[in-house]
Amino acid sequence: SRTAAEGSALSMDLDGDGSTVNGTTYLELDDNERNLMKFCKENFKHTIVLLNTSSAMEIGFLDSEEYNVEACLWIGHPGDAGLVGVGKLITGAVNPSGRLVDTWAYDLSTNPTFYNMDNNRYANGQDADNNTFYQYEEGIYVGYRFFETADAEGYFDSPAFTGHAFKNGTAAGYEQVVQFPFGFGLSYTTFEQKIIDSDVKLDAHEQNAVTVRVTNTGSVGGKEVVQLYMDAPYQSDTEHFGIQGRGLEKSKVT
């Protein structure tokens, strides 16, 4: 579990306290959690990870054979009543249809926001609270808009990026940077989406409409999320990000 709140920044370095390692952040696994997953692998047939956090974390461990995690579910902070629904999801009584509302990167330090946070204690202010501050400098490139724009412009393959030593080493290419993109989500069934009609107008004051047919191609009932993105053209030298989310709709149970 991880907690976070307005005005409460997350530590960039936990400075090793017996369960953590120097250089690790609050949004990485600590030693207790790693040992627990190793125990689960050695003593149980299946390991399912529940992410009880409101923030995106580093979850590259899902790809590791060391822990053999078979499934992972981000549950946010559901509360006591919400956990009843979580039980139904992991047992298959209910089919999940949620989608991520943020980009989950393998390494937090590949996100520019990582470098805009620090503490505000002066060198001679030993009695002052060591509160952290965040300097907002990203402009419009927040969340998925940064990652998708950087990919569209080739930044993740450029020497400026690949030559930089990030917290967890070096990375190159979108697939090595982004583990789960904005809007990602799985289901116990599969779906097919097909655009059957579109009414697209280039006039800025007109509405555009796209009709999508959703077909459940699996054997379990479920809901699908239709997501519409666009890459708008540059106009009047206005700053522009690569991909814009323009709409989403969830289907009925099919």
Where are these regions (language model features)?
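C-terminal non-catalytic regions of proteins with extracellular/luminal or membrane-system context
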Residues: 1-254
